[in-house]
Amino acid sequence: MNAMLNIKEGEFTSTIYTLIHEHKFNDAIRILQYQHERNPKNLAALSLLAYCYYYTQDFMNAADCYSQLSYNFPQYSQYKLYHAQSLYNAFRPADALAVVSMIQDENLLNESVKLEAAIKYQEDDLVNCRILVEQLPENDAAVIINTACIDYKEGNYEEALKKFNEATEFSGYQSGLAYSIALCHYRRGDYDSALKLISEIINRGVKDHPEFNIGMVTEGIDVNFIQNTQKLHESALIEAFNLKFAIYYRTKDFKAAKESLTDMPPRNEHDADPITLHNLAISNANSDFGDSSAKLQFLLGINPFPQETFANLLFLYCKNDYFGLAADVLAENPSHTFYCLNEYQFNLLEALIYMPTNPEESLKKLEKLEKECLDRLRKTAIEIQIKKEQKTTDSDDSLEMRNLIESYDDSLEMYLPVLMTYAKYYWDKRDYQAVEKLFRNSVDYCKEHDTWKLNVAHTIFMQEKKYKDAAAFYEPIVHKKYDDGILEVPAMILANLVVCYIMTNQTDEAELILKAVENEEEAALMMKPNEKFFHNSIISLVIGSLYCSKGNFEFGISRVVKALEPPEKKLGVDTWYYAKRCIVAAIELMAKNLLVMRDSVVMEVIQFLTSCEVPGRNIYTVPDDLFEQAGESKVKCNVTYEARMIKAALLMVFND
């Protein structure tokens, strides 16, 4: 065995301890597993194997090893405690409690009570958890921390904050404690204090653990993934970055939120903890529905998962019009429905899901929700006004005012989905005047909100003759990012604004936007040469579509074709969708003898469709993750297949 593993005789023990000291746990585990297979009752090998599993957060394998140790060596009571701790960390509270109850050693009494309290805490049995904690010595920092955790879970954040600070004074700086204090500040709405503590945790991590490669992924540096280890856990870095993400996501600084995730120590996706996986899913929900929904679905299958997962998955399905899937998930998970959704979320989801089949009932639910949301908004607005009139400079009052404003913003965020669901009902009926009336009635509460402005702009835009008014709503959204970050503005917003300018003869303003997008795409392409950028293409496609809709197909289609040059760089699901719409519309009119196009334009289109065949093989025109039924259907749902079919139809009409 030693020869096979290249370990010299007499150096086995020193080799194992060296590997552990150098944090090469996988190598140590491989050797110890082999040794354990040869001699299952070797105490040293099995205890070291258990330690390595525990240190690398593989708690189920650690529990299995400690179970064998406690059975084969009952004289060592600590193995039962370690067995229970492993089960607790593997989220097996009932099994952990059963093992704890078998520990008889008086020397382990305090540790056993602490673990039993932690198990009760994990099960949300806070009453018995507090009873157990109160049995422990008061001068123990762990007891102060445990009491603080109970206060936190009960929602008493002020008291929890005091106790965490007391524990820090008692035991000195610890990253885990600093994170707990930051979390209390976050719950209190004091984001500045939370971010200050998070920065300290991260700075210490950068200084003390350069091997964690903090921030290097954001800078585009290729680095090795790191493992989940006890050292990483003790640094509280993952928790700190996730809290930083939560703060920026809540304050709608989505760019900084994404950077929080890429800054954290890089790990393989299968090593990511549930919180990180959840945050990755929601951060990419708008750009990659398939990946986000897959992550959220996966999280629902593990225990525990972040409570927000269930609601976020359901709302993601509804946002993308997969109401049947949302209904199935809701029906298949009644326990999740009870524990993970509040009354507002449940009622809104029901209204969304049943709107296509039972609009009358859905509208009744929306009407009730709207009344509740507006009542809450009015009440909070009055409280804010009263507070403003008092004009105190006390810091506690300042925090209270901030919390009131945040409460108002939260109420507004609850009202907007209700309003938009209402609006969508009329939008789908193309009753844009009814939609505009709805938005006009909500102007007092929503006029400063970008989502409201954007949807008002879309509604006015669709009424065609109000392009100047639509531009007035689009402009503030675009101008925020005009000089730096215009690519962060969705391409359709830019395209609609350009169309507004064209239709109101403001060609100079339209050219300025096109030039700004072109310049930023060129700069971005230099930074990321292998990435595709579609903003300029989509804007040009929309302009081309506009000319086609006005009957000028030759100019419109030429603009569309040029927008996708070269196809290997510009072809994507969205760009192909707009391009094929114009071409198919032209073919239909040609087939009806209502349109004649010059031969040169037709040949240009044929050449374009041919050039799309190779890069279009892996670009699917329908979601390819959830709904693929068979290999044959998948073959027919890519750009290559559609380009060939359209080319065949065009040639048939052209040669007729």
UniProtKB/Swiss-Prot annotation:
Transmembrane segment boundaries: none
Distribution of this protein across tissues and organs: Expressed in most amphid, both phasmid and several labial-quadrant neurons.
One Gene Ontology term, aspect cellular component: ciliary basal body
Gene3D superfamilies given in the database record: Tetratricopeptide repeat domain
GO molecular function, one term: intraciliary transport particle B binding
Mapped TPR repeat ranges: 9-42, 43-76, 141-174, 176-208, 238-271, 378-412, 416-449, 451-484, 537-570
UniProt main location, coarse: other
Localization of this protein: Cell projection, Cilium
Keywords, comma-separated and alphabetical: Cell projection, Cilium, Cilium biogenesis/degradation, Repeat, TPR repeat
Biological role: Plays a role in anterograde intraflagellar transport (IFT), the process by which cilia precursors are transported from the base of the cilium to the site of their incorporation at the tip. Specifically required for the kinesin osm-3 to dock onto and move the IFT particles which contain these precursors. Component of the intraflagellar transport (IFT) complex B required for transport of proteins in the motile cilium. May be required for ciliary entrance and transport of specific ciliary cargo proteins such as che-3 which are related to motility.
Complex and partners: Component of the IFT complex B composed of at least che-2, che-13, dyf-1, dyf-3, dyf-6, dyf-11, dyf-13, ift-20, ift-74, ift-81, ifta-2, osm-1, osm-5 and osm-6.
Name of the protein described by the UniProt record: Tetratricopeptide repeat protein 30 homolog
Gene: dyf-1
